[in-house]
Amino acid sequence: MSFKTNAVPDEVIELLINVRPVIEKIGGVYLAGGTALSLFLGHRVSIDLDFFTPNDFLATPLSQDLNQLGPYVPIDVKNNSLVCKVKEVQFSLFKYGYPLICPLEYYSNISIASLRDIAAMKIGAIGDRGARKDFYDLYAILNYTSIKIEDILKDVCAKFSIPEDSLYHYIKALIFFQESRKEPDIKPLIKMNVQWEDIESFFCKLAPTLIQ
């Protein structure tokens, strides 16, 4: 796998590499979210590290280890869920019980969720809240990889153990922009030649084709 680091700031890459000994103590930890996707596609600037693990973990020893890596600011610290900043880079680790669809990839010996898994998680995120970054990310997956929306929806069913007749909620969420329109546009962070209006138009055309 060839990774793209042009859209991930140096300080994020530095923390990603330096944090490996810390997260290895917990086991089963992998990177997902926007930075993982940016390493695959280079489609937008991403400045945080979102890690997941199927394992339980204690927040206090993890916080102590992270504090050794540089200036540490706790944001939300509790067992099985930790959000903080390390050297001004946001770091999060959550216990996440949903299974991986595909084998992990590896960047500098850091486990990274596959594109298929990230795509399913993005659909899940859009179904929950629909942030602009999630729409941009899913657009990038559908336009810059060979992954089809139909395959992603099948993965959603497998990953989250939901029946196919429950997919209507996620399909409908693809054209629910009320919350995302309230957010500041992140176009300055986008490396693709696309405007937010193009994103909305794309999904408004796509969603009706998925309803049988």
Where on the chain are the PLM-derived regions?
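Compositionally biased terminal segments of proteins
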Residues: M1-Q212
